[in-house]
């Protein structure tokens, strides 16, 4: 089954108050895809396919604002960035039954114009002039973005859902991949393994109480000039529905209850520098949520198969030492 679609995104950014440089972008992309499927039993099938995935630069990547709040760690976006085009080939196996749902997928993707964050040390004794009265002093670390990455990624993912009993459900979602990244223009090369895991248990207790326990984590991610932080999390929730047709739901939850703060570390290397940063953010949370459902969805009303999702924006960015320019 072949497919082809056209996508266009137009952005116009204008500063009304405060310093900043107005900019606009226009992204136009043709996105092809091909998929093949074959059933090998009543509940099993194999699928193979190719698709192009478009990653458009986010506002932090594009914003040319010269962020020198910390004069020794300066960041600036690049409004001339192009869409990152990633080509992916995958083979997947799935099996479904009343007890088990399994999906295993092998995927290889590559791109030759990856949007990468590039950092370099200002070595000129008098600093470096970036125009508009913006000068980075000697010894400062200057970071921006460019379409310079050549990325190769091969990964294996697994999803398993087990209905252990009429009242108990156990699910696991895991992924492992190997990434090779390089920029010949900058003379940079990095590679490594990355993995993530997510799982949980849901159990229905007496009095229509639903207990959920979930957790997961990831190993450090690989970037062109270093690596970032891994993470782990866990949570517990207790849910109960009330009133006719269970319209009112009350949920008690707690997350990372034994961890008040979490540290995030970043390691970046260049030809003449090594930069390490660490930050702490609140991790523990707990609370109560209440929701009430108004109206009724009739069985004859078909729900929309898809909804608009803005999931094609390149991740990363932020203020200060973490990302591109952020207007003030």
Residue ranges and their predicted role:
Residues 1-20, 27-33, 37, 42-87, 108-138, 162, 255-271, ...:
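Surface-exposed extracellular loop regions of Gram-negative outer-membrane beta-barrel proteins
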Residues 43-46, 99-102, 166-170, 207-213, ...:
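Repeated loop/turn-to-beta-strand initiation elements of outer-membrane beta-barrel proteins
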Residues 76-78, 82, 97, 101-173, ...:
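Outer membrane beta-barrel strand-and-loop segments of large Gram-negative receptors
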Residues 6-12, 50-56, 65, 95-97, ...:
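Transmembrane beta-strands of outer-membrane beta-barrel pores
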Residues 6, 34-38, 91-95, 106, ...:
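Residues on the lipid-exposed face of transmembrane beta-strands in outer-membrane beta-barrel proteins
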Residues 242-328:
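C-terminal beta-signal and adjacent terminal beta-strands/loops
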